[in-house]
């Protein structure tokens, strides 16, 4: 199903009374408003963008299949710029989820595989523990995408249960991720899905690590990220020395995966739910309480990682509460993220605030301070979205693109773009 919608609104990025260290400039605009089923409705995760500028994502409602709630079982969507460019996007529903046994209501970001293939996971599956799927583009223009079930999680003790966050893809085409439950101790896992050796073969799941809580982290709250050297990094929401979470690494040593707690977190940085790569091996992360932190690798082999809070905005005007991991790093080293609640506007009818798009600008000299900016306070009014959630994309020219769960022209959510 296709819809064409023109850019509906250009919005001011600022409003009076924000607590800022510097004046933000730029423009935030709604570039697409989702519509009622059978189209895609309520995007619960951020988008990804192809080299040609096509936007892909998931919604946990909408589509053609009923029986999963009031607004159907969810979709994978595609938003294609018109040719020649006119500011319009054409929506195509690539796949409508079929129900809980076949997967339903996805709430995580997609990841690109080879030749434009898309991977993600959805709730449900054969055992009700989540299912990883593959979407293969058509062989010729105008054809249909093909959905294939990659793996249905079985839960403990066989493997993980309830994947969290998005998947990551390695150089070998393997998919990596984390589950909140499951594994040998039912406290979460990190897993690898290895593609088949030949067409038509079966993917193989390997539990790389089962969290156990003995000084270790437990219950990962987000997916993992994979470095160029193959090291896997992630976070747990609980466990560690103080019980408030960890930053961990997994490295292949002599043919076996070895887990290392890089940092046991403290009350100042607790219950993390996502990481992103920064420059020179630095990791940036976030917590549900709107804390942005930095994990610095040791200067010398055998040294300790250092974690420090870059910003703690919980409870401050213009900032708020993070629902899903959204952190992204721009080409100039700035950190971007959204808060689902908070901000200065309650015009959407949410007393906790309609959400905000935020930026941390790195210091210009070593030892300097990061500069905090609110780029946009969502309002839910006049086509604006509200309650942003899920990941952001920062383009090469510095635009920031994300989604809101609600709002827009028809109140079924939006795709927004911030232009510096």
Kindly give the residue locations of the regions a language model identified.
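Extracellular beta-propeller repeat domains
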Residues: 2-420
């Amino acid at each position: 199903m296709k819809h064409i919608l023109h850019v509906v609104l250009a919005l001011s990025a600022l409003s009076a009374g924000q607590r800022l260290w510097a004046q933000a400039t730029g423009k935030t605009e709604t570039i697409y408003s989702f519509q009622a089923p059978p189209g895609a409705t309520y995007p619960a995760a951020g988008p990804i963008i192809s080299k040609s500028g096509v936007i892909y994502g998931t919604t946990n409602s909408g589509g053609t299949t009923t029986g999963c709630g009031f607004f159907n079982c969810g979709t994978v969507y595609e938003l294609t710029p018109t040719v020649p460019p006119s500011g319009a996007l054409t929506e195509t529903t690539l796949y409508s989820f079929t129900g809980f046994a076949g997967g339903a209501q996805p709430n995580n970001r997609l990841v690109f595989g080879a030749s434009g293939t898309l991977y993600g996971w959805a709730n449900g599956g054969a055992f009700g523990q989540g299912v990883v799927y593959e979407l293969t583009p058509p062989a010729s223009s105008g054809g249909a995408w093909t959905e294939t079930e990659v793996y249905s999680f079985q839960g403990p003790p066989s493997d993980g249960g309830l994947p969290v966050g998005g998947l990551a893809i390695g150089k070998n085409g393997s998919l990596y991720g984390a589950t909140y439950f499951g594994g040998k101790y039912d406290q979460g896992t990190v897993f690898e899905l290895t593609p088949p050796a030949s067409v038509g073969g079966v993917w193989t799941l390997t539990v790389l690590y089962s969290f156990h809580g003995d000084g270790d982290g437990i219950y990962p709250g987000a997916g993992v990220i994979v470095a160029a050297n193959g090291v896997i990094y992630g976070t747990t929401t609980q466990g560690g020395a103080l019980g408030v979470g960890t930053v961990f690494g997994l490295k292949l040593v002599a043919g076996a995966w070895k887990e290392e707690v890089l940092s046991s977190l403290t009350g100042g940085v607790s219950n993390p739910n996502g990481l992103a790569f920064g420059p020179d091996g630095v990791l940036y992360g976030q917590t549900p309480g709107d804390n942005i932190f930095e994990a610095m690798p040791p200067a010398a082999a055998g040294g300790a990682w250092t974690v420090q809070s870059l910003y703690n905005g919980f409870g401050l005007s213009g900032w708020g509460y993070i629902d899903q991991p959204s952190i992204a790093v721009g080409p100039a080293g700035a950190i971007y993220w959204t808060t689902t609640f908070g901000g200065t506007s309650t015009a959407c009818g949410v007393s906790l605030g309609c959400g905000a798009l935020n930026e941390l600008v790195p210091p210009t000299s070593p030892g300097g301070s990061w500069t905090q900016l609110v780029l946009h306070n969502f309002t839910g009014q006049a086509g604006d979205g509200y309650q942003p959630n899920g990941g952001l994309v920062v383009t090469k020219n510095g635009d920031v693109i994300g989604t809101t769960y609600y709002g827009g022209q028809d109140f079924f959510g939006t795709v927004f773009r911030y232009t510096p």
